Amino acid sequence: MSFISLSVRRSILAPRLRPTATLARAYTTAKVDIKALKKLRTLNPVAMSKAKEALLSCDNDITRALAWLEEDALKAGAKKADKVKDRVASEGAVSVFVNESLTAATIVELGCETDFVARNASFVDLAAEIAQAGMGFASTSAEGAVLAGIEAHDLAAKMLDGRTVSDTITETIGRLGENIVLRRAAVVGAPSAAESIVVSGYVHGSVKGSAGGSAGKIGGLVAVTSSIKSDAHRSTLSQLTRRLAQQVVGYGPRFTTMEEYQKAGEQAEAPDAVVLEEQQFLFGGGSVKEVLAKISKEIGAPVEILSFVRYERGEGVEKADKPDFAEEVRQQLA
């Protein structure tokens, strides 16, 4: 039996090992630029490993790496969204946005699965940003300034920081791990109607997001119409609409006037329970109708409630049975 010396064996094996060694050396020579890594994570605070992967895939080009991260997050979100799409989103948040001139406003309800996510800063900011995006549906004339619903699929197609609302929701699903649904939205007022409309909103149980947005459990909008002749008039009406929005959120009326109440037919509740003008004003001074009459006399022009809307999170959604702790953990890890 013959033996092959160690040196001979090495000479035979060496050619086979060289390709692997070459590949290893090529891999290790691809290094992440530390300055680029720091800047990338400042612009997009992802995990260190994900930031490194993005830079290695993009030759340390920060602009390309940012795009890579966005695409990666969207893919991860789409995958997660497909897994959780059948879960009931009975929690969530309501957010309102009122423009600076107080002539138009929007309200949205964004649904999620748990109160924990509903209070998450990213979720709150998303709801607030979507409400702002809804301003694109505001009427361009005072004649069309009445309350109008916004179709969820139309709002989902609106752009939000370079991406559609739909894609932003999908990416957020990937990060937060819950089903997120844009349930409903509405807009009232007209940005150009500064001489005839004042709008205000209010959110109860408001939570602040990290980017300055806010959202809560119940929200409301109120728009009044009048002949506005001065800044003092507008200031008076601004305070009125703000208080009326609080009234709507707190008392939950379903009609504006007695005429609307009577047209709806027989009602189980008394008018002063469900008709906004017949309710006692939350801040005193008689009924809402009486307060409107007093302010009309004060500014020398009739003041009327144009419209109002009230959203409560999870309204009309049947809540699923809460899973036991172990099942809840499994769902979060799915």
Q: How should each PLM-predicted stretch be described?
A:
Residues 2-5, 23, 27-334:
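N-terminal assembly/interaction segments in proteins that build large macromolecular machines
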Residues 1-17:
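N-terminal chloroplast transit peptides
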